[in-house]
Regions:
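OB-fold and OB-like single-stranded nucleic-acid-recognition modules
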Residues: 1-18, 23-203
Length: 203
């Protein structure tokens, strides 16, 4: 008891909470959560310095909006697709990236795009409420640095455009993500006028 009293007043220290985070039961539960994140969501967590930091990091990682993105097999259509990326905090996450977001001068990144088996999301199902049933503030889960420069044309002129974070590659960047395969028949894009001649657009 004497040693605990010496730490009273230290910012962020709660002897009861800190001790609970270090119990064998808490450690085992954290192990299970990390295994779930890794095996299901492809999230690899950075090593925490203390049991308390580990608990808080896992809670923050779990308690966020969820998107389930339906992907179709890659048929050579232009655009991006599903990737596992490294985050600034040392963790990994599933993200939908456009091809212009990928560094084509990096052999590994270029090969990853070329060998991608699936294509951008066709359907997205979202969970917008937390475990208490309260709505998430979605603005807290936007990556403001996810903008990119794209090539556009206007009245016959080639332009460079700085695009703000898109719906699924920036605005949902800090959501938890699941990728599922959906039938190719659900994907009927119109990227050029000739796409309207496809059978899916003839009815």
């Amino acid at each position: 008891m004497g040693s605990r009293n010496t730490t009273v007043g230290v910012p962020g220290y709660d002897p009861v909470y800190d001790d609970l985070c270090a119990t064998p039961e808490a450690v085992s539960l954290c192990d299970d959560i990390e295994a779930f994140l890794y095996n299901v969501l492809c999230v690899e967590m950075p090593k925490a310095e203390t049991p308390k930091q580990r608990v808080e990091a896992l809670r923050a990682k779990l308690n966020r909006p969820v998107r389930v993105a339906g992907m179709v097999k890659n048929q050579g259509e232009p655009g991006g697709g599903p990737f596992i990326i490294a985050e600034k905090d040392g963790s990994t996450s599933l993200q939908v990236l456009e091809s212009v977001q990928i560094n084509m001068s990096d052999d590994h990144a270029r090969n990853a795009l070329a060998s991608a088996t699936h294509f951008n999301p066709v359907d997205i199902v979202c969970c917008l409420h937390d475990y208490k049933g309260e709505s998430f503030d979605l603005l807290k889960y936007v990556d403001e640095d996810a903008g990119f420069i794209s090539s556009k044309s206007y009245q016959g002129r080639e332009l460079k455009a700085l695009e703000l974070p898109g719906l699924w590659n920036g605005a949902m960047s800090n959501w938890n993500t699941l990728f599922v395969e959906v039938p190719l028949a659900t994907f009927n894009p119109v990227k050029v006028v000739l796409d309207l001649l496809r059978p899916a657009h003839q009815n």
